[in-house]
Amino acid sequence: KIKSEKVAKIAFQIYDQTHKILHNDQNKRGRSLLWAACFLYNSGKQINLTAYHKHSWYLIKNCELLGYSLSEKNIIAAIARYHRKTLPKKRHESWQNLISREDKSTALDMSLILRLASAINKRPDPVISSVDIKLTNNEIRFKLISLDQNKNLILEKWSLESCYEVIKELKNLELKVD
């Protein structure tokens, strides 16, 4: 639960600072689905660590999530599925389950935010207090703010930089990390 809370906190900071940059969520529906995904995306680790994102998708898709419609549950499952490794493909059942273009857009945008938040939170203990995000021209710059000024953030920076190709492909932005 603590890791999920850390990831959700950073995910919401990214969400709030990147409206119309990484997402176009007008009615904050994506934000509430992102919140659920932050708490469920790791659930597949109980089955298999290597492909846990796929198992998380299966578990979320097939469980009863009170308060969420079938469409919303499919989006939450897709956010968890695509927060790591490959991007959606037409042949993926997890992508085919998303009916509308809006659902696909929400799932893709929120999974990118979860991917970034998860990358920043690799350690068991919290080390990042917040992120500051700036957009200039075609560059998105992340400044990681540590809980401890003496803490080396090389793991977090390296992990976040691993998202470079995905951000470039999806949003045509150059990722920079300070």
Which residue stretches match the model-derived regions?
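Glycine-centered secondary-structure boundary/capping sites
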Residues: K1, L22-H23, K168, N172
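Divalent metal-dependent catalytic cores for phosphoryl transfer on phosphate-bearing substrates
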Residues: K3, K9-I133
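Low-complexity, glycine/alanine/valine/leucine- and proline-rich hydrophobic stretches
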Residues: R123-L175
